[in-house]
Design a protein with these regions (language model features):
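Proline-aspartate-enriched helix->loop->beta-strand connector
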Residues: 228, 232-237
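Histidine-centered active-site loop/cap adjacent to the catalytic His
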Residues: 334, 406-410, 422-463
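Serine-esterase "nucleophile elbow" of acetyl-processing enzymes
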Residues: 114-210, 223, 237, 257
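Solvent-exposed loop/turn segments at secondary-structure junctions
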Residues: 142-145, 212-217, 242-247, 359-362, ...
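Extracellular serine-dependent O-acyl
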Residues: 40-42, 346-364, 369-371, 387-423, ...
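Second-shell loop/turn segments in exported
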Residues: 142-151, 209-214, 326-331, 426-430
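Serine-dependent acyl-ester chemistry module
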Residues: 243-396
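N-terminal secretory targeting modules
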Residues: 1-135, 149-150, 168-177, 231-232, ...
């Protein structure tokens, strides 16, 4: 009987407890969330201000400084940022109807300097070529531009220029090592000197970096015809290929992202604008920036580092087509534009060198550094398979170009350079370290030193 009473009492208390429970106050909780966030934001600002880190945090854009330096900021023809596109990059590019977009002149960062003509060069390039100058232009995309390099001096253009001028100085120091301007009459002496390398034209060699991140062959063709030829180049060097593999075949050239949506779809443009504004509002708060800068330290992926002129998310393999017909169209576009480039340079009497740019899957995996092995693993097997198929097609296209114009173009394959590349050459799928750029510059130099237009050809001996 007693146990029954205790059970009833316990049951009664349990019911009373159940009746006393109340639902959570959802509205006060929802209201308190922004209040707490505001208080945390104010507290973060106070702490940052007291510690004297305000300027340091204000300069942080959610990525390492060198990444922010090289990210593109897209400007319209009025030189104002596009509504709906990120404006966190420091490398300003402006829309141009003919070439898609181009670098804004007279800008600099800790990593690069762009001259008033819009070339990556420390000094201006006058339209009228100085009498003693031998002028060479380097065209291409981000690899030729020198993406992620610490300064202008680490780029292919700068290293090639130094190598060419070193050759001229060497000719002056040791003239006996090169073929003389006048050949000897006697055969015994002639047989000796004809084995010596020809002298290169003497003068001040200048290699101008006209590459623009994101450019494909269509951009380069328009750039050459409209912007480069007026500068009277003595030779043209092109380093490209990769962008044509990731650019859909229905596009003639790389353009500012989402421009078709902006022009033809007002609701779509407005939605992109709202999304970007909300994203910037959140990521610009001291709370988020402080958490990223001092705690999370986010690093861009290999795909993000390799894709420089797109705001579309996704991995590199998504930009490389799995459709063989689409791949043929992309490579066919590349081949057609290269033919037109050869036609232009041939008509102007300008030597042309076309280099198929390096890519990390072209290296022997046993020769990759631990960092490069991690990049390759992150890119994945699907990417590797697709990019190798693409490069095989590009290589065939360049071989056909060389066969069609044997006297007007020299093609080079940089996809596999294991013997000449340093231990660590790649910072992502396609961009190179200074040491990697030096290997390319040396290969370009060897070819250029053999171009008849850049050589001193001695007269034939009198018989």
């Amino acid at each position: 009987m007693v146990s029954s009473v205790k059970y009833l009492t316990f049951k009664s208390r349990r019911r009373t407890y159940r009746k006393s429970r109340r639902p959570l106050p959802i509205l006060p909780i929802l209201v308190s969330i922004p209040v707490v966030l505001i208080l945390l934001e104010l507290l973060t600002r106070i702490v940052v201000g007291v510690t004297g880190k305000s300027a340091e945090l204000a300069a942080y854009e959610g990525a390492p400084t060198i990444v922010t330096d090289y990210c593109l900021k897209f400007l319209g023809e009025n030189r104002q940022p596009y509504d709906g596109l990120s404006d966190r990059g420091r490398l300003n590019v402006q829309r141009h109807q003919s070439v898609g977009y181009g670098l804004v002149g007279n800008q600099k960062s800790n990593s690069w300097r762009i001259n008033e003509q819009g070339f990556r060069d420390d000094n201006p390039v006058p339209l009228i070529k100085p009498k003693n100058e031998i002028r060479i232009f380097l065209l291409g995309g981000s690899t030729a531009f020198g993406q992620w390099n610490k300064n202008n001096q680490a780029t292919v253009a700068s290293l090639l220029e130094a190598r060419l001028n070193e050759r001229v100085a060497q000719q002056k120091r040791s003239p006996q090592k090169y073929r003389p301007a006048t050949l000897p009459y006697f055969k015994s002496e002639l047989d000796k000197v004809v084995k010596l390398p020809l002298r290169m034209r003497e003068g001040q060699y200048r290699v101008i970096n006209a590459a623009v991140p994101g450019y494909a062959s269509g951009n380069q063709l328009a750039q050459l015809a409209l912007q480069i030829l007026p500068y009277q180049p003595d030779a043209i060097v092109i380093l490209d290929g990769y962008t044509d593999l990731i650019l859909p075949s229905n596009k003639a050239q790389t353009d500012i992202p989402h421009t078709e949506v902006f022009l033809n779809n007002a609701p779509g443009h407005f939605w992109i604008y709202l999304t970007e504004q909300l994203k910037q509002a959140v990521t610009s708060t001291y709370l988020v920036k402080a958490a990223q800068y001092w705690l999370l330290r986010p690093q861009p992926s290999a795909s993000q580092m390799s894709l420089v002129a797109t705001e579309e998310a996704g991995s590199l393999e998504q930009h490389l087509t799995a459709d063989s017909a689409e791949l043929k169209r992309r490579v066919g576009r590349y081949q057609d534009y290269q033919k037109q480039i050869v036609t232009l340079t041939k008509g102007a009497g300008i030597p042309l060198i076309v280099g198929l740019q390096p890519e990390i899957t072209g290296r022997d995996t046993s020769k990759l550094s631990p960092k490069e092995q991690a990049i390759l693993k992150e890119l994945g097997s699907t990417y590797t398979q697709r990019v190798k198929s693409g490069y095989a097609e590009l290589l065939q296209a360049n071989q056909k170009l060389q066969a069609a114009f044997p006297k007007n173009v020299k093609t080079l394959n940089f996809y596999k350079l294991d013997d000449e590349f340093p231990k660590e050459a790649f910072s992502d799928a396609i961009h190179l370290s200074k040491e990697g750029n030096a290997a390319l510059a040396e290969r370009f130099y060897r070819v250029m030193s053999g171009l008849p237009k850049l050589q001193v050809l001695p007269p034939k001996p009198v018989k």
